Structures are given as C-alpha cells and as structure tokens.
C-alpha cells in the first residue's frame, strides 16, 4: 500500500470519510485527486459503487493498469483531469470524495460553486486529509519552523472548512471534525513512506497534535441552492475603431 500512496494513507482516509457517508451499490462517485487510485479501488470493492478515479499528477494509464490488475475495470474508470477543468456533465455524480488533495485547490472562494454542479441536488461532497487542529493566524509556531513552507498555508482546521462551505449557502454541513490521534497516525505513516523526510517527521514529533492532524468535512448539496453560471468566455464582436482621437 505504501508504494501506491502519494500522501496520507488512502485507506485510512477512505474508511474514515465513508463512515460519515451513505454509499449505496450502483452510485456514481467522483474520487477527486485519487492519486494512484487505491482509494477508488477500495470504494468499489467495499460499497459496490462506480468510481471515476480522477487525478492530475498521476498517470491515468498507470492507474488504468492498476485498476485492471485489481479486476475492477468495469466499475472504476481512470481519468486524467485538472480539478478546475473537469470533463463531466452537471449533476452526474451521487457523491464526490476527495482524500488528502482538496487543500491544493479547494481553498479558492469560488471553487465550491464550480464543484457542486457535478453532484446531484441532495448529493454529498466529502473531504478528508491533512489539516490543522487550530488555525495559525500569525507567526509559525517555533517547533514547526524548520518544516513549514509557504505552500502549507493551504492547510486549515475543520471549523475553517465549515465556514468556507457554509457561507456559500450551497451545502448543508453534516460533519466537520478531526481524527482522534491523527497526528500520531500521520507520523507513523510518514515514517514508513518517507523516512528520509526528517523535517516533517521532527515537526510531527514535536507537535503531538497541537496543530497538525487530519480533518474531515461532509456536506450535502441543498436542493434549492442556486449555482452561479460558469463563465468560460465572453462573446464579443470586433469593430474597428480609432485608438486615438487623431487617428481617422
């Protein structure tokens, strides 16, 4: 499993997140930022759902081979796509899940407006992954200083994510919480998959769950939610006009 993971343990995240979801056989599920598709294979085997294993960084061809080797190619479909440019029709999915990848794109104030159109009204969107137990509002805590880089400002607390989604008035938030002993599990997994990353390991050892851990959020698209139109281009017609008053 370690060789098939690009970040947090995908099965830990999938088990934790799905315990807060009502997945039924035959549902269509988007696994957004699926990495090497281990979570997608798990979702089908465990719940009998159809899964679109979608990722930008990892090869769809490689994921396709992994899916075939698992014998689930009739129900798990590898897709190479950017989370901001998804090749699906509106209201195609019953459920959308994102495991340890949503922070890379979901902090955008406009992103939920975009993503929610792909799930049916009443359908659920759930995320789980690395986050903060409390927000870091000013200076980086000293014990995290050697590890922290500017890209880690995408990490947030469960309460931050709740507010981020609630204010759109698109989702009814059903759960926003943290994983018990999440920091220790993060540390244990990182020691296995990246033992040479001493900066992160030392940060986790020193933190002991004060700031670092795993967060989870599940919301359901409101049936009366109004999604703004997605503007892909502005139609225009060129009419030649002088740029300066002195021009004919």
Regions found by a protein language model. Give the residues of each.
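A short SAM/SAH-binding and catalytic strip from SAM-dependent methyltransferases
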Residues: 95-107
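Conserved Class I S-adenosyl-L-methionine
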Residues: 174-248
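A short acidic, Gly/Pro-enriched loop at the edge of an enzyme's catalytic core
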Residues: 84-95
């Amino acid at each position: 499993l370690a060789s098939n993971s690009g970040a947090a343990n995908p099965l830990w995240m999938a088990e934790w997140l799905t315990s807060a979801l009502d997945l039924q056989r035959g549902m269509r599920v988007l696994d957004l930022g699926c990495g090497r598709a281990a979570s997608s294979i798990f979702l089908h085997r465990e719940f009998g759902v159809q899964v679109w294993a979608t990722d930008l960084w990892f090869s769809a061809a490689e994921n396709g081979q992994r899916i075939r080797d698992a014998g689930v190619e009739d129900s798990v479909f590898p897709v190479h796509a950017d989370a901001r440019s998804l090749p699906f029709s509106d209201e195609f999915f019953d459920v959308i899940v994102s495991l340890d990848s949503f922070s890379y794109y979901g902090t955008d104030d406009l992103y939920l407006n975009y993503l929610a159109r792909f799930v049916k009204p009443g359908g659920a969107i759930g995320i789980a992954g690395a986050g903060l137990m409390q927000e870091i509002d000013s200076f980086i805590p000293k014990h995290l200083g050697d590890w922290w880089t500017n890209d880690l400002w995408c990490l947030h607390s469960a309460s931050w994510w709740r507010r981020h989604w609630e204010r759109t008035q698109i989702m009814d938030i059903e759960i926003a919480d943290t994983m018990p002993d999440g920091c220790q599990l993060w540390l244990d997994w990182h020691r296995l998959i990246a033992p040479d990353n001493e900066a992160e390991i030392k940060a986790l050892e020193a933190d002991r769950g004060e700031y670092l851990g795993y967060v989870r959020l599940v919301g359901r698209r409101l049936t009366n939610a109004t999604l703004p139109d997605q503007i892909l281009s502005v139609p225009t017609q060129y009419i030649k006009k002088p740029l300066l008053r002195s021009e004919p």
